[in-house]
């Protein structure tokens, strides 16, 4: 166990769930530390007052519950979507992108309250411990960090349940009377891990899905929507302007009702192991398709291809926890520069788990029907010019062929 004897006051990232409630009591009983709780409203869709009441029941005097939904979407989710960031080809980074924001607020509250440490409930096997701590150290290099899962003697969730029963800490149950899946949720996504999901050969039970209906149960009639963009960010739906968080919440509703955004994947964790999770990102899945569509008519080919080359590295930085790193900020500057003329409107058809782009328009469009038409282009393009273009590009290939024959 790491030595934390000199820690007097700790700010705990507190959800009110099993892990963090046990941690709260453990910090009090094992370290004798004064605990401050921070609960972020990230749009997880849960009432936060139970977390406050639970903290009060456990003797906490300083309780911070903050609505960070707009900050989350505007300053973290939207910048990430400007890059079309996807980890390992499929994962829209819904958990990853929330961690630096939580760390930022933990550091801010520690400064306000005079706390000398922060604590989190991430396990020693996962990515979140890295994300929380890299972000915290980037913002305050001297902060002390307590990660109880790496320090205490508990080895399983069963051990935690026994501790909770001993200390009369209430634990939520699922419909089957068991402790719930390991769940993370915010306005962008929800994820479920553990129990039967640990067997990647077994299909996830339907009750695991919290954010979407099944595609099979979705309406037989398609839903048509239009998403408007300015400088790479979504600003409106069907011509109605709305705030960042409100817009994403509305897209979530459309995605939920049409069975969009389900993902069952096995991913490579930063710490070296593979894990299986069931993710739901209804609004984000729609947003990604819409953003790529508006870029298709407003981005120059060279810029678009360079963005696609940079994206995997950018996504990896977020997944690994390097949001506040200089390299992520460098890439962000380039990505944001590329978005200066990414504006317009995209029409989407949503149908039984599918997002289909059926129209796109922009006042900054680079698409020219005069250039591309199969009909008379009235001199807009001279097809004879292609001969020289091909000859020059073929020069090295012909030279190689002549040598090798």
From Swiss-Prot:
Binding of L-citrulline, residues: 91, 96, 127, 131, 182, 191, 267, 279
Residues binding L-aspartate, per UniProt: 123, 127-128
Gene3D superfamilies given in the database record: Argininosuccinate synthetase, chain A, domain 2 (3.90.1260.10), HUPs (3.40.50.620), Single helix bin (1.20.5.470)
Signal peptide residue numbers: none
GO molecular function, one term: ATP binding
GO biological process: argininosuccinate metabolic process; L-arginine biosynthetic process; urea cycle
Subcellular location: Cytoplasm
Domain of life: Bacteria
Catalyzed reactions: L-citrulline + L-aspartate + ATP = 2-(N(omega)-L-arginino)succinate + AMP + diphosphate + H(+)
Primary residence: cytoplasm
EC number from the UniProt entry: 6.3.4.5
Entry keywords, A to Z: Amino-acid biosynthesis, Arginine biosynthesis, ATP-binding, Cytoplasm, Ligase, Nucleotide-binding
NCBIfam families noted in UniProt: argG, PRK00509.1
Family from the record: Belongs to the argininosuccinate synthase family. Type 1 subfamily.
Subunit structure: Homotetramer.
Protein's UniProt name: Argininosuccinate synthase
Organism of origin: Sinorhizobium medicae (strain WSM419)
